[in-house]
Amino acid sequence: MESTPFSGVANQIHTLCERPTYGEVKDGALDVKRQHKCPGPTSGPSPGTNLSGCIRMNDDPSMEENGVERVCPESLLQSREYSSLPLPRHTSSTDGTITSSDPGLEILNMASCDLDRNSLCKKEEDTRSASPTIEAQGTSPAHDNIAFQDSTSKDKTILNLEAKEEPETIEEHKKEHASGDSVVSPLPVTTVKSVNLRQSENTSANEKEVEAEFLRLSLGFKCDWFTLEKRVKLEERSRDLAEENLKKEITNCLKLLESLTPLCEDDNQAQEIIKKLEKSIKFLSQCAARVASRAEMLGAINQESRVSKAVEVMIQHVENLKRMYAKEHAELEELKQVLLQNERSFNPLEDDDDCQIKKRSASLNSKPSSLRRVTIASLPRNIGNAGMVAGMENNDRFSRRSSSWRILGSKQSEHRPSLPRFISTYSWADAEEEKCELKTKDDSEPSGEETVERTRKPSLSEKKNNPSKWDVSSVYDTIASWATNLKSSIRKANKALWLSIAFIVLFAALMSFLTGQLFQKSVDAAPTQQEDSWTSLEHILWPFTRLRHNGPPPV
């Protein structure tokens, strides 16, 4: 709603024209109870107003009628001062549409005061004529009329003086408001800056709010994309229709002016006016095109301001994502470095294991005197080492992972399965033995044999107590290795020599069997019966097939 320059004045006239209500009459005296509402602007009471003067009650029974007549000008004076003084301040705080320096405002104020005064006087005359029983003590009607005329003359002089003093007070108020505006003008700028800073701090502080705003804006843009083309076409069509209608109206106006020119040929002034109208209409068409272009530019700028706010939120969200990516990338690089260090720490252990196996084989070949004892003790170790080679890589991987978790200081999760341990205790004993052998190379051979026996006994006992799955496969591997070694040795040796030796062994066995049968002595009283060849063969081979107890019989 646009405020007109006379809206505030009309409100003041309405409030000033409210009539007071009079009370009852008692004991032949005039008992007046006046309740007057304090007039003022709609914006609220201004400081400095005295509310006690707005409501007055006269309870004195000996009050004269002049008291009633004097209440009206006093209240009018107060309302006049109240309406004239705070009005410029109120109007200056707004957009300046209402100013008290207009001459029409002064005329309306004076007219309102005269109307109030006349209405109150007429009301008093009506009350006096309607109540003949009301008489003032010690006064007469003539005296009342004289007093009433005196009061009205005094009111007129006071109003004239106020009308003269009003321009001076208005100019003073204008100066005060001009100085006040010059002082107060820089304050809104600072408040706007502080609000913008607070908003920027809030958006940068909370990343979740930025992300939520980003999601909301992205969803809004995606929804607008579906209807964007239709809306553009619709707006273009409405713009074209408006321009066409405007052009039609302008052409109609020009046609009317052309039809009006032959009617006003004799009048030169009318001809000049018609020419001016034609020029103004042409200028109006140009102004309409300019207004349309400016309106489009203004709409584009407003849309750009809205989009810039959305883009600012999106940029903030992208910066947060970049910061998060940089942080996670740094953590990933640190984890990679830790894993590389763990792998480097485990590589020397693998090299040590290979060296220990080679040195063990060399030491066994270089000790012919203790060959039997060492081979017996080394059989399970070789079996274990042969089985361990296939599973060492998996064990190293599991151990590396567990050690990396320990170094990082994080606990393994409960859902993570426990790492299987494929390495038995005697393998660690072998590693310790090899370390001792490296340290004590110059020691004597018996001391080395004793260490071998000591390590062999717990390894065998642990093997019996804790049988593992890979023992069978390791035994099979050792047997296969022995067979391959035997084949290779046979291939290397002379085949004729081996064949001759085998033939001699078989011939000796056959001869021993035949001599045992031919030179066997017969025993007296032995049963003689004819048996088949299979029974005689069983009888011959019974010492080898029957069980024999070499020990004494049980008691």
From Swiss-Prot:
Keyword Cell membrane in annotation: no
Similarity-based family: Belongs to the IRAG2 family.
Membrane topology of this protein: Single-pass type IV membrane protein
Compositional bias ranges of the Low complexity kind: 91-102
GO molecular function: microtubule binding
Role: Plays a role in the delivery of peptides to major histocompatibility complex (MHC) class I molecules; this occurs in a transporter associated with antigen processing (TAP)-independent manner. May play a role in taste signal transduction via ITPR3. May play a role during fertilization in pronucleus congression and fusion. Plays a role in maintaining nuclear shape, maybe as a component of the LINC complex and through interaction with microtubules. Plays a role in the regulation of cellular excitability by regulating the hyperpolarization-activated cyclic nucleotide-gated HCN4 channel activity.
Coiled coil, from the record: 227-341
Self-association state and partner proteins as the record states: Interacts (via coiled-coil domain) with ITPR3. Interacts with SUN1 and SUN2. Interacts with microtubules. Interacts with HCN4; regulates HCN4 channel activity.
Modified sites of kind Phosphothreonine: 91
Cellular compartments annotated: Endoplasmic reticulum membrane; Nucleus envelope; Cytoplasm, Cytoskeleton, Microtubule organizing center, Centrosome; Cytoplasm, Cytoskeleton, Spindle pole
Cytoplasmic topological intervals: 1-495
Domain of life: Eukaryota
Parts of the chain on the Lumenal side: 517-555
Gene (name only): IRAG2
Listed transmembrane segments: 496-516
A GO CC annotation given for this chain: plasma membrane
Location of region: Disordered: 84-103, 128-147, 437-469
Entry keyword annotation includes Secreted: no
Pfam families: MRVI1
Tissue specificity field: Expressed at high levels in pre B-cells, mature B-cells and pre T-cells. Expressed at low levels in mature T-cells and plasma B-cells. Expressed in germinal center B-cells, splenic marginal zone cells and B-cell lymphomas. Expressed in neuronal cells in the cerebral cortex, epithelial cells in tonsil, adrenal glands, zymogen-producing cells in the stomach and epithelial cells in seminal vesicles.
UniProt keyword list: Chromosome, Coiled coil, Cytoplasm, Cytoskeleton, Endoplasmic reticulum, Fertilization, Immunity, Membrane, Nucleus, Phosphoprotein, Transmembrane, Transmembrane helix
Lineage: Eukaryota, Metazoa, Chordata, Craniata, Vertebrata
Name of the protein described by the UniProt record: Inositol 1,4,5-triphosphate receptor associated 2
PTM section of the record: The removal of the C-terminal lumenal domain occurs by proteolytic processing.
Biased amino acid composition, Basic and acidic residues: 451-465
Compositional bias of kind Polar residues: 129-142
One BP annotation, GO: nucleus organization
